[in-house]
């Protein structure tokens, strides 16, 4: 502490002694007194309707050429969606869409997505039994691509390319399906593949090589090698 004589001397010189203030103890006390819950964000509790999945709806557009197959196979589509997935399904005649909705009996969170993939696979041209695998198995996927994205073709060149993908009597397509354990649908210039991730990759590689002009014999050899490597890996 400065004495009175030193303070008077500093006052005469015109300078003021600055004392260092210690705020460490005060800051510690302020932090201890602070309420950690004061700045917490309070969220309202989730509604029971959202937990039960009410109100979720999916619409799948049905192309015109699939109206008759949908009508003929409606019972096969209706049964697994309602009995196994516990969903509500109907065909809206006005919008030409298949509407799938959850209800109180719906238990599985992914049931709505499985049913939507199942119906979409059927509308793309897959058989009901093949599309039903999307409901039973979780590791199956659906992939589509356009031949024009691989190689731009027009007119007769596009028709010959699609013919190479199918083969005589569908032999090439069936061979690729059997080797890669997938299902393939050729719809105009669109190609739809149903299977597991690795198998879809093998089938897509074979189809793209055919589009690019490789002979089927070389494509078969490459495809069998890739399929054997996938089999050894798993």
Curated annotation (Swiss-Prot):
Residue stretches making up the KH domain: 158-207
Family: Belongs to the PNO1 family.
Subcellular localization: Nucleus, Nucleolus
MF (Gene Ontology): RNA binding
UniProtKB keywords: Nucleus, RNA-binding
Official protein name in the record: RNA-binding protein pno1
SUPFAM superfamilies referenced in this protein's UniProt entry, alphabetically: Eukaryotic type KH-domain (KH-domain type I)
Location of region: Disordered: 1-39
Record has rRNA-binding as a keyword: no
Top-level taxon: Eukaryota
Record's GO cellular component terms: nucleolus; nucleus
Biological process according to GO: ribosome biogenesis
Pfam families per record: KH_KRR1_1st, KH_PNO1_2nd
